[in-house]
């Protein structure tokens, strides 16, 4: 492996830090939606759905429970919070569970994106249904895009059911504010 110049090392460190900061804001987006969601939308029947489908409650439970699978399979040294029951969890329970699993996923990603030779997270195992990948930026991209996809579903479902979210504030698009809420001293870069 070729030695990296200081400039290359600094550039890679900046990219790593940006990915970690973005993931830190990921849960802030979920928390924002949970804080502004009308409680009547939590288990509301889905519009036009005849064969099941996930309620907003079930989608938030799915997000949390996927995080637990990633943690158990990729970072077994990290403690997992309890799973959420998609049929019984409350909004308050989901918010608390997401804070805990989000913090553990950030710890997992911090190790996975580390250049340290003794890192504990060397693989990303999503479950028995999928191939295992090397831990790294692709792991981050999968985790973030999975959650962004389901956030979009949640916002669309709420809107379709008449429970508009984030219509008076930039919400999930106001990343500078999310950065501050996540306690980050930097700004998106």
Q: Each PLM stretch: what is its role?
A:
Residues 107-117, 186-189:
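Juxtamembrane/interfacial segments around transmembrane helices
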Residues 72, 76-113:
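Helix-adjacent hinge/juxtasegments
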Residues 2-5, 20-31, 40-86, 125-189:
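Short, contiguous alpha-helical
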Residues 3-15:
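Short, contiguous pre-domain boundary segments
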Residues 111-129:
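Acidic catalytic patch
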Residues 13-20, 91-95, 140-144:
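Active-site rim elements
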